[in-house]
Amino acid sequence: MKKKIALITDVHANVEALQAVLLDMKDKNIDTIYSLGDIIGLGYAPSETVRLAIDNNIINIQGNAEAYVTMGPDMFPYLKRNNIERYNNAIWTSEQLSAEELDYINNSPVSVELVINGNKIGLCHFPLDVRYDFIGVWKYDGKNPEEFLKRNTSDDIEKYKPELYENAKIADKNPLLFGKNIFDFDRIIYGHYHFERNHILGNVILDSLNGTGVAITDKAIYYILENGAKLIKYEVPYDYEKVFRETEENDFPNKDTFKKVIRWRKLW
């Protein structure tokens, strides 16, 4: 059966970028749209962004930005310790969302498994669990996919920082990739780092996608996966200067980081 899936990731409350890619998708006969996480966080328009996702039946997967809302930022001590503005942004983001929008975020799955034309595909924000793997999630440089070999279930909990032990217990009840090893899949597609990489580990294809709303480009980016095999990238012009102006005019935590990303396209 032919199937056409659109993939976005790391919108980061950039509603203008999301609007642009949705408009571009309209004539492409898309079956389903998946967001690979971080649809919120950083940007000034979390409510408008989530509303747009709901209205367009986007299936959103939880990333770390969603986890900061669903689990609460206090469950991630490194935020308050290392990035107080990101901590405050998580609280502010939560306060901007309506009950329906919060419900959408709370009910976002941590991963999705698809079988298309015999290909087993895992969709996630990152192949290591952003809810508790502090070390692995933040050190990846795009060069060492072997880091993804370990499982994300109770077998590994003791290896992680004690301060995130409670998070690991929560995550173990709803494990990333359903507790499977990456070798249980033919392909893993993910976001998180906002850069594009392609690796083959054993017989598994690992695709890292460019961010839709936060990327080293002035375009909004999305992908179409055709029949579980061909991954096509689309770059859509959008008014990022308007996003910069709106950022200047709105008062919200971590706005300087968002301005840097949008205007100068520097990632962290």
State the predicted function of each range:
Residues H12-A17, G41-G43, A65-M71, D129-V130, ...:
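Active-site environment of divalent metal-dependent phosphoester hydrolases
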Residues M25-I30, I116-N117, I182-D184:
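Glycine-rich phosphate-binding loop signature in dinucleotide/nucleotide-binding domains
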Residues N56-L114, V137, G142-P145, L149-T153, ...:
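Active-site neighborhood of divalent metal-dependent phosphoester bond hydrolases
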Residues M1-A6, L114-G122, I200-V204, G228-A229:
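Beta-strand-turn-beta hairpins that frame and shape the catalytic cleft
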Residues R197-W268:
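Acidic, His/Gly-rich catalytic cores of divalent-metal-dependent hydrolytic chemistry
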Residues M1-N56:
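N-terminal active-site segment of His-dependent metallophosphoesterases
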Residues I8-T9, I33-D38, L42, N60-N64, ...:
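Active-site neighborhood of phospho(di)ester-bond hydrolases with catalytic His/Asp-centered motifs
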